[in-house]
Amino acid sequence: MNNKIIETLEFHKVRQKIEPYLLTEQGFEELRQLEPMVEVHRIQQAFDELTDIAQIFVENPYFSLAATSDIGPAMRRLELDTDLNIAELLAVKKVLEVSKSLLDFYGNLENVSLSQQLDKLFEKIELFPHLQGSLQSINDAGFVEDFASEKLARIRRKIREAEDQVRQVMQDILKTKGDMLSDSILASRNGRNVLPVKNTYRNKIAGVVHDISASGSTVYIEPRAVVTLNEEISHLRAEERHELNRILQELSDMLRPHGGVIRNNAWLIGHIDFVRAKHLFARDHQAVVPKLSEKQDIALLNVRHPLIAKPVPNDLYFGSQLTAIVITGPNTGGKTIMLKTLGLTHLMAQSGLPILADKGSRVAIFKEIFADIGDEQSIEQSLSTFSSHMTHTVEILRAADQDSLILFDELGAGTDPQEGASLAMAILDDLRLRGIKTMATTHYPELKAYGIETSGIENASMEFDSNSLRPTYKFMQGVPGRSNAFEIARRLGLSDIIIQSAQSWTDTDSDVNRIIEKLESQTVESRQRLDKIRDVEQENYKMNRALRKLYDELNRERENELNKARLEAKEIVDMALAESEDILKNLHAAASLKPHQIIEAKAELKKLAPEVVDLSKNKVLKKAKIKREAKVGDDIIVTAYGQRGTLTNQLKDGRWEAQVGLIKMTLAKDEFELVKAEKAEQPKKRQVHTVKRANVRGPKARLDLRGKRYEEAMMELDEFIDQALLNNLAQVDIVHGIGTGVIREGVTKYLRRNKQIKEFGYAPQNAGGSGCTIVTFK
């Protein structure tokens, strides 16, 4: 398809209307590359995908998926044996997570019958539970967790201990030499903890000067007592960076062999996102999937222009027996809009997009669409309007064939009316003989007679309301346009004498205008009747859908009730059989019956039992069972450590292998909890503390605020208390240490204000004493 028609009909604006519905970068890329297709099977494949996604939305109206970014550059870096950074690893992690969520969604689909097209997309997605588990060591904020490796955990523990010592030393100096300081708050310079010392006391505190204030009144000194500790922290930070780089390299090496498959997963996710976006566009714009006609038999029902805010719907029939439709009549009535609507509708359909029309519409497939629309006069070439249009027309006539659609706006305009009309008829006749479908607009009256007298050519016009003197923009197929100049002039106040005089000059055309006026009236009446019929059909269609849905629901309820009744009946019969067995034993013991009589009696009783109900195929029970059982690829929380991982394999003894960061663990069923799937469009929130649901007798939760800044500690305390209340905890411990008492005082004030707190107090001496507060909830 030539690029000129895409620009002329503003197809790029249609793409822009679909953009807001996309969630993935790959989906955006597919939309950017979207162009009309000419292969029937490719267009039909796109339409089948739209039909399938519509079926999914009937049962799952909120179907969505999480946003993903472009991992193409990251995969190319892996191919070049380069390691990925944290942002790139996070992007890959998100692709793996969305892959799993889509496969889980597909596996749980019920009451949906899909064609092979969408089935294939879901089935081509591959899972990598080991990789997914390893990437859990990087949280969604881009922080590499301590459990990524034992060495990293050890280094960070040492850093925290050293920093605690530094803070303790600094706090001691603040207490003992506070009068020498210009501020009671610790400062930081060049990455070192320093004291803001008054310049007059700079020699009283031994240490390294790192900075002086602008006024010179304050000197920032790193006390000698913490220099060694700070040096140790710097060394540990360097070790931490080295270990982080090693972890990133290890994760990159794990991903490298699977780069191609992961890239394909990203494409599949993006394509499903693109199909979903097309469906949402169709839903919001009342668009439909049209039928394809290989015989160029076009039928557009209530078709609308997609770029107009409040378009007027029109019917357009361009059957295989027609080669041209000529829209005659005055300007400003919407003739050009009809041209563009026909062209743009076919560009959309051949791009696999739904069209703004009613169900039952048909479109043709054209290898090329040409258009000469608007004033394309070339100033550089010093061409007149007529020359410019004719140059373009010549190019179109040379390039067009039977698989083309041609759109002419004001064919033959810009020159002598008689010659222009003759040229227009000659051009249309040439295209008619060559069997090339054409729609043309014109204001030449000569073309009305040409349309009536020539086979394969049909007249059309745009309706004009003579009462309001405004165009209605209604397309009237089969009715040539007529002039409304006399009627407009009369309503605007021109004298009847002048109008009658003018009419006397055009008596030869008056009969034709009266016939056209009558045809217009009949067409309007027919259209109104057709609209009423369509309204009734639409109501019937809605009623049928509602009845079908109700019928399906009743069938499901009936099946559920029958299964319930069978189970109850089986329980009753089992109880009866058990009781009868006891009775028969007693009778046999009493020798009141002969053995063969007992056997016969038991046989008769067993006849009362119904056949065993096979519930293995019950979809509801199967789905419930799936929800209760863990499976490979599920995200978990290791209860002993509160760390997140992924199940990778189930062992024969019932235990599970799980990947937690870079560590593989073997866990029993009661040593982990399944993580519930998060909603697709909501980003995962990082939880600072994992609090398990507990009752009054359950385990306690503990929050450690030691070493935190006051603001950070208060934020974590607030979040921790909220989580404890949400999880029904009865009691929690808050470790704040003794230190300067600032955080301890802040904790006390917070707890006093919280109405959900029943009581709180310091822990016993053997459990932390005044450095720990025990909180009991109401």
From Swiss-Prot:
InterPro entries referenced in this protein's UniProt entry, alphabetically: DNA_mismatch_repair_MutS_C (IPR000432), DNA_mismatch_repair_MutS_core (IPR007696), DNA_mismatch_repair_MutS_sf (IPR036187), MSSS (IPR046893), MutS (IPR045076), MutS2 (IPR005747), P-loop_NTPase (IPR027417), Smr_dom (IPR002625)
Signal peptide residues on this chain, from the entry's feature table: none
GO biological process: mismatch repair; negative regulation of DNA recombination; rescue of stalled ribosome
Record GO terms (molecular function): ATP binding; ATP hydrolysis activity; ATP-dependent DNA damage sensor activity; endonuclease activity; mismatched DNA binding; ribosomal large subunit binding; rRNA binding
Domain Smr: 703-778
Cited Pfam families: MSSS, MutS_V, Smr
Residues where ATP binds: 329-336
Disulfides per UniProt: none
Keyword match Secreted: no
Enzyme class: hydrolase
Enzyme Commission code: 3.1.-.-, 3.6.4.-
Keywords, sorted A to Z: ATP-binding, DNA-binding, Endonuclease, Hydrolase, Nuclease, Nucleotide-binding, RNA-binding, rRNA-binding
Subunit relationships: Homodimer. Binds to stalled ribosomes, contacting rRNA.
UniProt function note: Endonuclease that is involved in the suppression of homologous recombination and thus may have a key role in the control of bacterial genetic diversity. Acts as a ribosome collision sensor, splitting the ribosome into its 2 subunits. Detects stalled/collided 70S ribosomes which it binds and splits by an ATP-hydrolysis driven conformational change. Acts upstream of the ribosome quality control system (RQC), a ribosome-associated complex that mediates the extraction of incompletely synthesized nascent chains from stalled ribosomes and their subsequent degradation. Probably generates substrates for RQC.
HAMAP family: MutS2
Family: Belongs to the DNA mismatch repair MutS family. MutS2 subfamily.
Protein name per UniProt: Endonuclease MutS2
Species the sequence originates in: Streptococcus suis (strain 05ZYH33)
